[in-house]
C-alpha cells in the first residue's frame, strides 16, 4: 500500500506543479491550439489555449513510478518489474507519437498534425514491440507479463488467441495487441474534446485499476494457491502505475477543468490510451476494461455509427460526432455535458468493479 500512495502522491504533485509552468511557457511563445472553423462556434474562444499539457501527465506518471520503485528497492520490497516497464514504455512511445503530432500542429499553425499513414505506422510499430515483449520475461513461476489467452477477469482457458503458438499464432496475437492498443489510444484521443472530459474519465478508470491490481496482489496465486486467486505476473507494480495515472490526471485536471487553461493534446491522450491498453493486457482483463472504460467505447461507437450511416445512407445520426459534440450542438452547456459524461464513467466503473468482485466472491465460496 505504501508504494501505491507514494506513486499517486508524487504523480499528483509533479503534474499539478509542472502544468502551470507549461502554461506560462507556451503562452509566452504564443503556442496555442488551433480550432477548426467548421466546428462548434462556441469552441472558437478556445483558440490559442496552450496544448501539449500531456507532458505534465507523462512526467507525473513516470517520475511517480521511478521514485516508488527506487524507494521499494532500498526498503527491501523489490523493484522494477517487466510488466510495469513494458506498460510504461508503451505509454511513453505513444506519448512521443502524440508529441510529434502536437508539435507539427503548432509549427504549421493549423489543426492538422501527423498524417494518418505516419500515425498508423507509429502506433503499429509501438504495439508490435509491446506485443512481442509481453510474452517474454517469465518469472520464477513461469508467468509472463501477458498470456495468449483472451481475458475477461482472468484468462479464458478455452480461447487461445495464438492457437497454441507457431508463426500464425504469433501473428494473430500481435494483431490482437495492435487492435487493443490502437482502440484505446484512439478512444481516449476522441474523448478529449471538452474541458476536463478525458482527464476526469481516465482518472476514474485508473482509480478502478489501482484497486483491481492491488486486489490481485493481495489474492495472488504466487503467495497462496486458493480459490479465486489471480495468475498475474506483477500486480503490485501494475497498481503503482495505475495510481500514478490517477494522481497525474487529477493534478492536470486542476488546470484542465472548464475553462481550461491548457489542453493535454495528443501527447496526453495517446499516452493515457496506451496506459489503459497496457494495464488491461498485463492485468489480464482486456474484456473487463470494455465495461470499466464504457464511456470511451460509447465515444468511439458514436463516430463509427456516424461514418457508417453517412457512407451507406448519406444521413447523419448525430448533429456532430463524437457524441459529446452532439449534445453541445443540441444546446447543452459544455460543463453539463462533461459532468453528465463523468457520471456515465463513474457508473461504468462501479459496474465493472461489481463484476470483478462478484467473480472473486463466486469462486471464493466454491
Swiss-Prot record:
PROSITE patterns: MRAY_1, MRAY_2. Pathway: Cell wall biogenesis; peptidoglycan biosynthesis. Its EC number is 2.7.8.13. It comes from the Bacteria. Keywords: Cell cycle, Cell division, Cell membrane, Cell shape, Cell wall biogenesis/degradation, Magnesium, Membrane, Metal-binding, Peptidoglycan synthesis, Transferase, Transmembrane, Transmembrane helix. GO terms for cellular component: plasma membrane. CDD domains: GT_MraY. Its cofactor is Mg(2+). InterPro entries: Glycosyl_transferase_4, PNAcMuramoyl-5peptid_Trfase, PNAcMuramoyl-5peptid_Trfase_CS. It catalyses: UDP-N-acetyl-alpha-D-muramoyl-L-alanyl-gamma-D-glutamyl-meso-2,6-diaminopimeloyl-D-alanyl-D-alanine + di-trans,octa-cis-undecaprenyl phosphate = di-trans,octa-cis-undecaprenyl diphospho-N-acetyl-alpha-D-muramoyl-L-alanyl-D-glutamyl-meso-2,6-diaminopimeloyl-D-alanyl-D-alanine + UMP. The chain crosses the membrane at residues 3-23, 55-75, 80-100, 118-138, 161-181, 197-217, 238-258, 262-282, 290-310, 341-361. It is found in: Cell membrane. It is a multi-pass membrane protein. One of its GO terms (biological process) is cell division. GO terms for molecular function: metal ion binding; phospho-N-acetylmuramoyl-pentapeptide-transferase activity; UDP-N-acetylmuramoyl-L-alanyl-D-glutamyl-meso-2,6-diaminopimelyl-D-alanyl-D-alanine:undecaprenyl-phosphate transferase activity. Belongs to the glycosyltransferase 4 family. MraY subfamily. PANTHER family: PHOSPHO-N-ACETYLMURAMOYL-PENTAPEPTIDE-TRANSFERASE (PTHR22926), PHOSPHO-N-ACETYLMURAMOYL-PENTAPEPTIDE-TRANSFERASE HOMOLOG (PTHR22926:SF5). NCBIfam families: mraY (TIGR00445). Catalyzes the initial step of the lipid cycle reactions in the biosynthesis of the cell wall peptidoglycan: transfers peptidoglycan precursor phospho-MurNAc-pentapeptide from UDP-MurNAc-pentapeptide onto the lipid carrier undecaprenyl phosphate, yielding undecaprenyl-pyrophosphoryl-MurNAc-pentapeptide, known as lipid I. HAMAP family: MraY (MF_00038). This is Phospho-N-acetylmuramoyl-pentapeptide-transferase. It comes from Corynebacterium efficiens (strain DSM 44549 / YS-314 / AJ 12310 / JCM 11189 / NBRC 100395).
